[in-house]
Amino acid sequence: MIYLDNAATTPMSAVAISEMTKVMQETHGNPSSIHSHGRQAGKLLREARQDLALLLGTKPQHIFFTSGGTESNNTAIIGYCLRHQNRGKHIITTAIEHHSVLETIDYLVQHFGFEATIIQPVNQEITAQQIQKALRDDTILVSTMYANNETGSLLPIAEIGHILKDHPVAYHVDAVQAIGKIPIHPEELGIDFLSASAHKFHGPKGVGFLYASTGDFDSYLHGGDQEQKKRAGTENLAAIVGMVAALKEDLNDQVEHYQKLSALKTTFLEEIAGLDYYLNESNHQLPYVVNIGFPGQKNDLLLLRLDLEGISISTGSACTAGIVQTSHVLEAFYGSDSHRLTESVRISLSPLNTEEELKQLAQTLKNIIGD
């Protein structure tokens, strides 16, 4: 069995499992309780927040624990926009965002009268100049991803952040696919809100965090004073500890992992050099996602045949799995009538993958396409 769908989710690291198990076995208190068991849990929660803040180059009060990327995106977008709608109701985002951003913004448009400008990519790129040209006097939020979940394309976050410093506009970045893979320090990049999800960097599912430079946003969940009164509900302490442990491990080996994944991608492409294929990517890319198409090969059938051979890849975002639809990202890149929409598959790597696995994938593709 070969797992090559790491942009959907990653296997948990042994360190994260060990740290979580220890918490589940030894720490039973509610972090909000004032007795000794609660204080013990509260201490672990504070330490996890401090450690995570240190990894991001910020302060603990800027870290809010959530259930994952989707909740973090919703909290930042809805919480900030509803708090500041008296200043304006214009939002800027891009056509290649994750559905948890696009549909959240659409919710504000449909139910609260907001207006959204959706930036379209040009030559598979989103530029800071496009964002700048879209700014209006009533713009209150810009929301972009750091790295695209389907293609691995990188957006010019630092450049956008620099431009927005001169405007009374908050900048939200969905960093779910980038964090742990490249250095990210939100304060240096001019980011006001940053979303992340643990299961994308070998942590547990169902936990994530939101970095917020300010507490000037409305609570998304109500009924308790947890997370500095911004996220009601008892914190998932074991998962939070596991998440921080996983991120520490990924960041410690970040350079080595980047080099390894770049080499694995190169090896794979060399192995399939004899096949007719094309890549769906931009000039600025993360190496761990390979969005590739083979002319004349339907992606759903190719996916099935690889699955029968014990190889797991995908056709795009797992959040729309089971729904028969083409990629909105590739549609934005190439148009709704492009053959790439029905031919392209996503191969996404992690440091746990090996050169032998990529060679086996290449040989299996040659066997299938050569039939």
Where are these regions (language model features)?
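Pyridoxal 5′-phosphate
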Residues: M1-D371
